[in-house]
Amino acid sequence: MLDWILSESFLVNVIAYAIPIIFASYASLISNKAGISAINIEGAMSVAAVTGALVSHFANSWAIGLICAMSAGILMMMLLALSALKLKADSFLSGIALNTFATGACLLIVKGVLEGRTDSSTAPSVLVPNVNIPFLKDIPVIGKAIFSQNLLFFIMLAVLALLIVLLNCTRLGVQIKTAGYHHEAGESVGVSTRKTRVIALIICGAMAGLGGAYLSMANLGYFSAGMVSGRGFIGIAAEAMGAGMPVKTTLFALLFGAVDYFAVGGQTVLSFPYELLNTLPYLMTLLALTIYAAAHNKKTNK
């Protein structure tokens, strides 16, 4: 088993499994910074996954599919903005309702668009291409894992850098953090909390859209009902463990990706029942949130 964990293929697959979780964690990070809980990241990823798959298939273009997937994620977040910011509904309950809506909407979209097919729970897609960097991809152990990856991996690295710059070096970043931590002070100097939160939710939706697109347009090459499988919630947990810091959040998302792949790959390496291995990502989420809550309460009580 140790040889398997230390192998190059293990690292390649860990990163592949972590990418949608990382995008989900970035979506959670930016919304939480603005002071709004986007619990519907899971649903946004599902709608983005089916939209990206279908549009890329019919347009025969992964780029158009990717843009439409991001747009679908943004649309889901605008529904949250309408409910929570305009109509003053509870953002958590609104998010749960939108997740439930997304589950049925995805199947309805597939059945409506691909009517007459035998299997109406899946939709084909055009794959986002892989990027192979000459020479660097031949570096032992890390070469294929980092320098021979799907294009969305490199987009994820760019998003990480942009998030760091946005939150620490721009006026918008200051406004987003002000909307989340000191919105009364922001309002007093003319910063609209609602407008800032809407902008944050647009960014959040784009991130969720990229995560959903990866699942249907890079990981599998088709949309399948239930393919998000809790990764949106796991991304939220990774962001909670990372305490709103982009690099730490990415590292925790990678950890969850490792556990996720271990649950799948371990079925052929270990003799444990696969049902037990499939519970590992969710047990890890519960443990992570428990540790985070304990640490947060300890800090609050000091």
Where are these regions (language model features)?
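Transmembrane helix-bundle core of multi-pass membrane transporters
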Residues: 102-169, 270-277
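Single transmembrane alpha-helix segments in multi-pass membrane proteins
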Residues: 9-58, 62, 66, 71-92, ...
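Hydrophobic core segments of alpha-helical transmembrane domains in multi-pass membrane transport
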Residues: 24-25, 49-53, 103-107, 153-166, ...
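Cytosolic-side transmembrane-helix boundaries in multi-pass membrane proteins
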Residues: 181-195, 266-302
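Loop-to-transmembrane alpha-helix initiation sites
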Residues: 92-93, 119-123, 150-154, 197, ...
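Short loop segments and helix-boundary regions at transmembrane helix junctions
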Residues: 33-37, 78-133, 229-230, 234-247, ...
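Helix-loop-helix "hairpin" substructures at the membrane interface of multi-pass membrane proteins
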Residues: 145-223, 246-251
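Transmembrane alpha-helical segments in multi-pass inner-membrane proteins
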Residues: 208, 219-282
